[in-house]
Amino acid sequence: MRRRRGIVGIEAAIVLIAFVIVAAALAFVALNMGLFTTQKSKEVMQRGLEEATSALEVDGSVIARAIDADTTTGSYNIVVDALAVPLKISPGREGIDLDPSKLTVRLLLPNGFYENVYCGYASGSAGEDFEAVLSNAPTGCEPYTTSPGPFVATDAYVYVINGDGDSVLELGEKGLLIIRLDSDTTATIDVDYLEPYDKIMIELRAVSGASLTLERVIPPTLPPLDSTSDATTGTTTYAVAPVDLG
């Protein structure tokens, strides 16, 4: 009769322990790979969400400035030559760099298109009137020598209210995107001011995130204004008034 050798208890235990250790190691590797993949997926989704949403959002009504560009007494040419767009950082975003190399402002006007009119940023405080904000343009923008008065070039800048002095608009800080449109009718080049029913499209694009685009239409009626010019003294007085564009 042939003898057959069986497995004793201790040998079976060793084999089972080996199986358990190998299975545990494989389970740990699989779990670790799963957690790593999940984390990477979250990061990709977060980056995609950041690229799909703008870091800026409009924080209130857009205010425009109406001016009578005709300085002849009793004669009127009331147009819009400046806009202020209130901005803030979108929820979940840390901030946006306002340096001209990292932000662009595109304009689509009835008379044409500007690829980038952004010229910088400036800091101010709450309580300043519109004319003060328009006068405090940063270095690199066209100087505004006569306030109130027309602008000799079309440009844009961000006016930071109650900021900390750096170039980053952060959560809790307020910014005004100032658009100044060429309204100098004495120059030989075409002007860019807006008349009733005209539409303006503004696009802000930062180095990351989606662009912020907004459109506004000038209302059919503007405030009654009358700029004057004294031929004897050569003094010109421009009449201006704010307009709420919503």
UniProtKB/Swiss-Prot annotation:
Residues 1-6 form a propeptide. Its main location: other. The keyword Ion transport does not apply. It is found in: Archaeal flagellum. One of its GO terms (cellular component) is archaeal-type flagellum. GO terms for molecular function: structural molecule activity. The keyword Transcription does not apply. Pfam families: Arch_flagellin. InterPro entries: Flagellin/pilin_N_arc, Flagellin_arc. Keywords: Archaeal flagellum. Belongs to the archaeal flagellin family. This is Probable flagellin 2. The lineage of its organism: Archaea, Thermoproteota, Thermoprotei, Desulfurococcales, Desulfurococcaceae.
